[in-house]
Regions:
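Beta-strand-rich binding/interaction modules
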Residues: 103-110, 471-472, 491-545
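Zinc-dependent metallopeptidase catalytic helix centered on the HExxH motif
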Residues: 285, 322-385
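Extended, low-hydrophobicity, Ser/Thr/Pro/Gly-biased non-transmembrane segments
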Residues: 36-45, 55, 142-251, 540-549, ...
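N-terminal, polar/Ser/Thr-rich
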Residues: 21-78, 82, 162-168, 472
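Hydrophobic helix-coil surface modules that form long, contiguous segments used
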Residues: 79, 175-176, 187-340, 369
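A surface-exposed beta-strand-loop module
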Residues: 31-32, 99-162, 533-534
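Amphipathic alpha-helical substructures
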Residues: 414-496
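Acidic/His/Gly-enriched intrinsically disordered linker/tail segments
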Residues: 364-424, 431, 449
Length: 564
């Protein structure tokens, strides 16, 4: 999902970020709000949507088939969804999900109607018989209704009903935090992905419908058009999408130097933007090549890659990325931020997926860090450091990067899963001090967890394994604690006093200081330590662009050390 940063502030910093030959000559202040950010109250509605109860864990979905008709004039949809699954345990009741404003017309299995009850967004389905473990089964749901409209897509999601400048309907949807059950009946939990899917979308004549995957068939009649899209890879439910509009196909190809396979690039754009898109979308191939080099092969080669011109800024729908940035490059015409960021999600978020929205930094933090890595690849390390400085400005420290689990929480006003998540990786890179090892960790993490749903703890385990060291102290502080570490210090004529604040006793991040032209590595702990100064002023800002921590003068340290 596109990062929520004020464009005016970006422009203000533009010349500093891009043209500077060195790191910024200021120490960026770190904030630790006294009051932590709140989470939503755990209502029954949240519990039913977010938790993997026995009514969900009892079955594993392997295929979804959506057959949906979109009626733009009424902002109305109707259709049938067939969920094919395999039983994990014996059961006779399961839970699927559909927002309560959407009407269920029929619910069947094996051509027999099923009894069901609805509570909030949950639908509890009583099967006609006990389903045995390992048995395959399917249920069919016919439904209709007016889905929720997005207030601020893609962050505050739902359907987007707009018209292009020629007056044609132009429709999209984004539902990462709200869930797929906003518009189609599904097992709406991030820890279960179908192995494949088919999406059939019917729209009024003269309009086209685009979804994920490959276009299998088009049925054109005098009044309606139906488009059949097939997804041949696992896909998380919120990524299943549709776009409706008067689109024109822009075809291209990408030849991988990693796999030596050719991926089809089938972009769908509004006809009056075709010539702009033809030039502008060439940059896609540069980004795919860069990410393949860093993290391995593009994950969805059979399904291709496409940008679809959308009536909102952007969203990382798998193999069908929403694009709404107006064909503008950012940062002195170097790259289109939306394309760069959303394409990164094909590796981070779509290939490697968080099993719970609380671990969304694996999507957004990694994708935001990819932006900085791309800047480094085209402009060098100093530009990379300056880009990281820009991200650091927005860190809020109101909540831990890994949020509270089982509540499906996402707040677009709090950018820390983006920018602090990115800084976790940046700080880890500095702390490991071995770029070859660091990037091997990232690539291994992606390749070992391709098409899997994971938690932050899986990344911690891999870092510990690859480095041969225990980095639990690092991740406990930067992922699971809210506050940033602060280095308290003061100096007398001949002594520097220092210690960590807002950390546990096992936090052992080394830092560098400069005394004249000499660099000294300190190993602070929560206990006060000293270093001889010889009347020279210490510079703590030497690696403030390499590590995330704050500094604070505490003149009481010389007195306090006597009482340790």
């Amino acid at each position: 999902m596109k990062q929520f940063i004020k464009n005016t502030f970006r422009l203000l910093l533009l010349s500093i970020l891009i043209s500077s030959c060195g790191a910024l000559g200021i120490h960026m202040k770190v904030y630790n709000p006294k009051k932590p950010g709140a989470y939503p109250k755990e209502t029954r509605q949240i519990t039913l949507l977010a938790r993997n109860t026995k009514y969900r864990s009892c079955f594993d979905v392997y295929h979804n088939e959506l057959n949906v008709e979109v009626v733009p004039s009424k902002k109305f949809i109707s259709g049938t969804v067939i969920i094919s699954a395999k039983a994990v345990t014996d059961f006779d009741t399961l839970q699927i999900d559909l927002y309560k404003n959407m009407k269920i017309k029929t619910l069947e299995s094996e051509n027999q109607g099923l009894i069901y009850t609805r509570e909030e967004g949950a639908v509890f389905v009583k099967m006609n018989r006990k389903i045995k473990a390992d048995e395959k089964f399917s249920i069919s749901i016919t439904y209709e209704g007016t889905p929720i409209s997005a207030k601020r897509p893609p962050w505050d999601g739902g359907f987007v009903w707009k018209k292009d400048k020629e007056g044609n309907p132009w429709i999209g949807i984004a539902c990462e935090s709200e869930g797929s059950s906003l518009w189609w009946p599904s097992k709406d939990i991030m820890s279960d992905e179908a192995d494949s899917a088919d999406v059939l979308i019917t729209v009024p004549k003269k309009l086209m419908a685009v979804s994920n995957g490959v276009l299998r068939d088009s049925i054109i009649t005098d009044t309606k058009n139906t488009y059949h899209w097939h997804i041949s890879y696992p896909i998380n439910n919120y990524n299943v999408t549709l776009y409706v509009g008067n689109f024109k196909l822009l075809h291209d190809t990408y030849a991988s130097t990693i796999t030596w396979k050719t991926t089809q690039l089938n972009h769908y754009v509004l006809p009056y933007n075709y010539e702009k898109a033809k030039f502008h979308f060439q940059q896609v191939k540069k980004y795919i090549a860069f990410y393949e080099k860093k993290f391995g092969a593009y994950p969805w080669q059979r399904d291709g890659f496409k940008l679809v011109e959308s009536p909102y800024a952007g969203m990382e729908h798998q193999s069908a990325i929403a694009y709404g940035n107006g064909y503008k490059n950012d940062y002195e015409n170097l790259f289109d931020y939306i394309i760069l960021h959303e394409t990164a999600h094909e590796w981070w978020g779509n290939s490697v997926t968080a099993a719970d929205l609380s671990d969304g930094w694996i999507h957004e933090g990694f994708a935001s860090y990819c932006e900085a890595l791309y800047v480094e690849s085209i402009m060098g390390h100093e530009a990379y450091l300056n880009y990281m400085y820009w991200q650091r400005i927005s860190i809020m420290n109101k909540r831990p990067v890994v949020r509270k689990r089982d509540i499906r929480y996402f707040d677009y006003h709090d950018e820390d899963i983006y920018v602090k998540g990115s800084w976790v990786l940046h700080t880890l890179r500095t702390t490991i001090g071995n770029d070859s090892l660091f990037f091997n960790i990232l690539k291994t993490f992606r390749e070992e967890n391709n098409q899997k749903q994971i938690l932050s703890e899986n990344f911690v385990e891999l870092v510990n394994k690859k480095t041969g060291q225990d980095y639990n102290w690092f991740f406990k502080q930067y992922l699971f604690n809210r506050e940033a570490p602060f280095l308290e210090y003061c100096w007398t004529n001949d002594t520097l006093y220092f210690r960590w604040k807002n950390t546990d006793t096992d936090f052992v991040l080394p830092i560098k200081i400069k005394i004249k032209d000499k660099t000294i590595v300190l190993h602070p702990t929560t206990k006060i330590q000293t270093v001889a100064l010889s009347n020279d002023y210490p510079d703590f800002y030497d690696n403030s662009n390499e590590l995330y921590y704050g500094t604070e003068v505490n003149k009481k340290l010389p007195e306090l050390i006597r009482n340790q």
